Regions:
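DNA-binding patch around the recognition helix
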Residues: 123-128, 151, 194-225
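His-Asp phosphorelay/catalytic-motif detector in bacterial-type signaling
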Residues: 45-47, 71-75, 186
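Short, Lys/Arg-enriched segments at the junction into DNA-binding effector domains
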Residues: 2-3, 114-174
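Basic, amphipathic DNA-recognition helix from helix-turn-helix-like DNA-binding domains
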Residues: 59, 65-130
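Active-site beta3 strand of CheY-like receiver
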Residues: 44-50, 55
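Short hydrophobic/Thr-rich beta-strand motif most characteristic of the beta2 strand and flanking loop
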Residues: 25-34, 40
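Charged docking surfaces used in two-component/phosphorelay signaling
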Residues: 12-23
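Conserved acidic carboxylate
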Residues: 8, 32, 55
Length: 225
């Protein structure tokens, strides 16, 4: 049974989502501001977090940034009532695994949660993948290049894992989205592109200046060995 932490100052929505998700088999704890959320995170270890962009004592984006520093592999799904593209972009740039606009269909929220939890609980991943100067540990969620080590989010790790399986060969964007996000991309959905952009920043270029991850128009992405 998966444990969720729902962070939202909308008490009515929290109650509705908590009851719905409980009926769907989740154990739900709710926090209504950033301070409560930090206390809950210290006291418990949720399997995933649902986080609202707007909180009464600060930005949910700031809390997300802290979450990513302290719990890089913890799945985080963001909610926003503002519907601003900038919120979505910032959330994904800061490492949210997925993003939904409010009001959202509880069934879609449940499906997104199950997808991200399946990815986080996936078994059979190789413990270590080495390619040139890069070493990726799926178990630890870290990538090392020389002396530099970076922590990856769940989505970033799944993207890198898929690209390293076929170095030098493109992976179709829809196939990569299914592996990394657990769903297909909809029209104008740039979630995958944002995760790849974050991953590129963490990896940096090769010593000769070549990008490690290359985008091929109409074909997807590839890792350049």
């Amino acid at each position: 049974m998966s444990h969720l932490l729902l962070i939202d100052d909308d008490l009515e929505l929290c109650d509705l989502l908590s009851r719905w998700l409980s009926q769907e088999g989740f154990v739900v704890a709710a926090s209504h501001d950033g301070q409560q959320a930090r206390q809950q995170l210290q006291a418990n270890s949720p399997d995933a977090v649902i986080l609202d962009v707007m909180l009464p004592d600060g930005s949910g984006l700031e809390l997300l940034k802290q979450l990513r520093q302290e719990h890089p592999e913890l799945p985080v799904l963001m909610l926003s009532a503002r519907g601003e593209p900038l919120d979505r972009i910032l959330g994904l740039e800061l490492g949210a695994d997925d993003y939904l606009a409010k009001p959202c269909d509880p069934r879609e929220l449940t499906a997104r949660l199950r997808a991200v939890l399946r990815r986080s609980q996936a078994t059979g991943k190789p413990q270590l993948q080495d390619l040139g100067d890069l070493s990726f540990s799926a178990a630890r969620g870290t990538v090392s290049i020389g002396e530099h080590e970076a922590s990856l989010t769940l989505s970033e790790g799944r993207i890198l894992e898929a690209l390293l399986q076929t170095p030098g060969e493109p992976v179709d964007k829809q196939a990569l989205a299914q592996l990394a996000l657990g769903r297909k991309l909809s029209l104008y959905d740039r979630s995958l592109d944002m995760h790849v952009s974050n991953l590129r920043k963490k990896l940096g270029p090769h010593a000769d200046g070549r990008p490690r991850i290359q985008a091929l128009r109409g074909r997807g992405y590839l890792y350049q060995p």
